[in-house]
Amino acid sequence: LVASHFSVMSKKTAQILTAGPAVVARAMGEEKTKEELGGWKVHTKNGTVDNGADDEAACLTEIQRFLSFMPDSVEQLAPVTKCDDPVDRADEQLASIVPKDRRKAFDMRRVISLVLDQESFFEMGAGYGRSQITGLGRLSGQPVGVWANNCKFLAGSMTTDGAHKARRFIELCETFSLPIVSLVDEPGFMIGSQAEREATIRHGTSAVLTAAMTTVPWASVMVRRSFGVAQAAHYGPEGFVLAWPSAESGPLPVEGGVAVAFQREIAAAADPETRRRELEEQLAARQSPFPRAEALGVHDLIDPRRTREELCRWVGRIQPLLPALLGTAKFSIRP
């Protein structure tokens, strides 16, 4: 189960345990039920299993849905289905879904649903590594892996759990030759004492290096933030990169960069708070997508409403590349 590419637990009947209640009580002095020790709430939160379902019939439906995106083996391509959703569908919600206030969150899952073929998104691991969203979907009928930041949880930063979740998902896509679509709103590695104790840097770097080792096509859309070392995990080798006007990128978010680089200048100012805001505004202008687009750092700066159309065109362009990816799996199964 734990070594599977996808796993699902029944909420009513399933538990996963290394030792049952009697053994735990005798050895550890803990009085716990099987559900408390290893029920679906425990294991969908800690990442042991991907999804939970109401009963066994619902579990089979989840498995069937997962397999609908998968090829029969690594020697075959994933099945492309007929798509009645217009390639050039441009949803007006995308034009205003990212708030003008950089500190406000938005619904990345809504972005995903508006860009992919309608009702095609199948999320995996929603309860684990919650700052990252991973799942399978379709663009013009072509199965793709979808990875995005969830700014509603820890601002979408890359935590230890999030990095582990992303790494496993990238490896899944690489193994089965699924193109990857990354919707980027990455503020960087999670900071703070707990993040340091959890070795976020090490686990985050593992995700970055896994992305760098892939051979499948990538399309990355800079929706908003793209900062720090963590951002590198969102861009595959020779990937196709699009940017929205709301995109901002750099080594550090403005607030952190100003606080570190201009600490003395701010402290010496007659009005430190005013000076801090002035510096943040100056640097924010440099982190906009326009200088990067002018320097050919992205393939195109687009109206967000064109995202689906551009990604569907990309899917069409990469079709000749996919057969060459078939064969021996590049990654073993790493839980």
Language model features with spans:
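Ligand-binding clefts of soluble mixed alpha/beta catalytic domains
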Residues: 2-335
